[in-house]
């Protein structure tokens, strides 16, 4: 039995079916649609496999156009937009059952030295991940035991996720909450040594909790949901090399939610406080009661 980290690496190992055309698996899940982070991660793998491997990705911009169907393979068609002296650009279209469900543009850059460097420090000091409970442990503590569906999900989860602030369970607790969240994350097992796999694994993870910041002032993160939500777009900037199987802090905030959409921004740091990745995403929120 492979562990969830090995299954993630396998999920990101696309089948090359033609020049610049790849096929990715879409596991059978109980979810209504394919997880967006999976599609983004696989699309970035497809883009990266058409480069020389000497230029790491420095940015991506993507749109989620239609929900993907679990259990149905996804085909990734790569367009070689540019191969310059310093930059490489790829455009990827994800197709499922003849329909475009996602597109992504990624830019790869040959590392250069500019002679200067700076970054803002993390916004706050947080406990180390070893001091914090896992999400599953927090839910077990609150409910006494994990519901069977959540237990299955926890066993399949490729990332260990630990919220910096304890989960809130009632509307009274979230009444004065700021639209901010922070989590420690790392893959639950080794991911190998291919930098592209680590980049694409973190891309997968970046879609897991980012919209939490939008929801925190509205409803408890765990428990019955009042809203259906879906990622609309996703943008990432990769600043420094990293390993997704080592702890990273994902600091998230939502500057605005209006018109049925919420904007979330994320900053990903290593344990020493170095900024690794910046993320921005907009999500769609609709009331489940139809109001």
Set out the residue ranges of the language-model regions.
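Terminal targeting signals and extreme-terminal segments of soluble enzymes
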Residues: 1-291
């Amino acid at each position: 039995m492979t562990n969830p980290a090995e299954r993630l690496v396998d999920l990101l190992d696309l089948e090359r079916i033609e020049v610049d055309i790849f096929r990715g698996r879409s596991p059978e899940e109980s979810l209504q649609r394919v997880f967006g982070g999976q599609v983004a991660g696989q699309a970035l793998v497809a883009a990266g496999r058409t480069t020389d491997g000497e230029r790491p990705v420095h940015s991506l911009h993507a749109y989620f156009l239609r929900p993907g169907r679990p259990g149905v393979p996804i085909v990734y068609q790569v367009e070689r937009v540019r191969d310059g002296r310093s930059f490489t650009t790829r455009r990827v279209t994800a197709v499922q059952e003849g329909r475009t469900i996602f597109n992504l543009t990624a830019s790869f850059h040959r590392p250069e030295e500019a002679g200067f460097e700076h970054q803002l420090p993390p916004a706050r000091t947080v406990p180390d991940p070893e001091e914090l409970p896992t999400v599953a442990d927090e839910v077990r503590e609150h409910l006494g035991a994990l519901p069977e569906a959540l237990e299955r999900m926890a066993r399949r989860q490729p990332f260990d996720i630990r919220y910096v602030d304890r989960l809130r369970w009632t509307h009274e607790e979230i009444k004065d909450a700021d639209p901010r969240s922070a989590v420690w994350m790392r893959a639950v097992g080794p991911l190998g040594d291919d930098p592209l796999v680590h980049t694409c694994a973190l891309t997968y993870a970046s879609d897991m909790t980012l919209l939490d910041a939008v929801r925190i002032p509205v409803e408890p993160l765990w428990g019955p949901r009042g809203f259906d939500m879906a990622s609309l777009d996703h943008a990432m900037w990769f600043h420094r090399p990293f390993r997704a199987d080592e702890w990273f802090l994902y600091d998230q905030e939502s500057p605005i939610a209006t018109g049925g959409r919420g904007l979330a921004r994320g900053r990903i740091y290593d344990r020493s406080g170095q900024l690794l990745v910046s993320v921005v995403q907009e999500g769609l929120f609709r009331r489940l009661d139809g109001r």
